[in-house]
Amino acid sequence: ETDKGTIECEQVVIGAGPWARDFWNMLELPKTANIKGKDGKMHVTDMWTYWMLQEGVIGVEPDFLKTNDGKQPPVVHVDSTAPLYSDKTKKLLTDKIWGIYYKPDIEGLGVQGGTSPYIVKKHFDQVNVDPYGIESPEYQTTDAFSEMWCSALAHCQKRFEGKSDLYRKGPSGGLGCMTPDSFPIFDRFFENVYMIADANHGYKMIGVGELVAKEILGTESDLLKPFRFNRYEKGELHPTSNSPFPWS
């Protein structure tokens, strides 16, 4: 049912990113997951956890990261345990594991990227996803983020040293909705609802649409089998990453 009336269909496909929680609740699916541990015991955890994804842009020249032969560079992702010092004050920012990613901004504003996100310390039903992104009055990147990210850029590539003042201040970032193990769920519910809860893996999901379409038409995918919802109760979990990013 919608504000425009009832829409009938044979199959519903839900791929709603950070709004996965809302559709999950509409379907009255469980708010907790039963997870079978290595010890054989069942553990109960919240079905969803929201993370705040912090991102920004440093206003360097558009070709600042071009390769020696003039081509566009790849997305750079770095996880490190090296001490990180401020590019401005040289003070220690962290001596714990940290991570960043960066690439040329698609609008030509410089270099865009982010740091490892942080957990929103609220029950998932209390998190306001809307208004989303730059429109959110509650979830925005901080000054601490800009100092950390710009300093990490300088740590990774000397060409960024002394460039922290070029950071473009403004609203940025957004929420991510993570599953209990931070890996996606691809599964069918109530016979004709297919859920793609991608846990913000983004670019890694490029090939999923075709696999999901084939499953809906009756050809089960061996690649998607490990991502069924019942993996939690069966204890068929994915490896735990040591990365500070929940989707790595």
What spans do the regions from the language model cover?
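Helix-loop-beta segment of a Rossmann-like dinucleotide-binding subdomain
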Residues: 1-9, 191-198
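Flavin-dependent oxidoreductases
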Residues: 2-139, 154, 160-162
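C-terminal catalytic lobe of FAD-dependent flavoproteins
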Residues: 119, 123-131, 137-248
